[in-house]
Every structure is written in structure tokens, then in C-alpha cells.
Amino acid sequence: MARSLKKGPFVDESLFKKVTAAKDGEVIKTWSRRSTIFPEFIGKTFGVYNGKEFIPVYITEDMVGNKLGEFAPTRKFGGHGDDKGKKK
């Protein structure tokens, strides 16, 4: 279910303060995967936490409106069963 239009997009207040205070080229670490990407974020690099480490995400114009968490996957695909060492 999508967020109501009357509420507007969500972004953590602390994250927005970090973005305005950040210098160019600085990686902004965040645990807020639920925050919406705003146009003010374009050209900045965020370190988005995936539960284990911070994944660097460079924000481009196409990403505006999406959530930060969409670009830092939390699960690693190990692949389907291989036939390693199995001989016919």
C-alpha cells in the first residue's frame, strides 16, 4: 500500500540535517533505509546499512522518489544447488 499523498514523502530529520551539513565527497552513513530520496540528495554518496555493513550508494537523478534501502540488498543469493564433486 502506497503512502498517502496528503502526508508527503518521509525522510528522517537527522538524515536531512546530515545532508545539509555534509561536504562534497563525504560519505553520509545512515541506518535509515526507509527514507525517501529527495532532489537535494543528488550527487551525494550515502553509506546505507544492510544489516552487516554500509553499502556505498551514489545518488543520481533517476533515484529520486525511491527509498534508500532499495539500493542496498540485505540478502545474499548463494545460488541454487550445484553438482560440485558429483560424477556421473
Curated annotation (Swiss-Prot):
InterPro entries: Ribosomal_uS19 (IPR002222), Ribosomal_uS19_bac-type (IPR005732), Ribosomal_uS19_CS (IPR020934), Ribosomal_uS19_SF (IPR023575). One of its GO terms (cellular component) is small ribosomal subunit. It comes from the Bacteria. GO terms for molecular function: rRNA binding; structural constituent of ribosome. PROSITE patterns: RIBOSOMAL_S19. GO terms for biological process: ribosomal small subunit assembly; translation. Coiled coil: none annotated. The keyword Glycoprotein does not apply. The keyword Metal-binding does not apply. Keywords: Ribonucleoprotein, Ribosomal protein, RNA-binding, rRNA-binding. Belongs to the universal ribosomal protein uS19 family. Protein S19 forms a complex with S13 that binds strongly to the 16S ribosomal RNA. This is Small ribosomal subunit protein uS19. It comes from Mycoplasma mycoides subsp. mycoides SC (strain CCUG 32753 / NCTC 10114 / PG1).
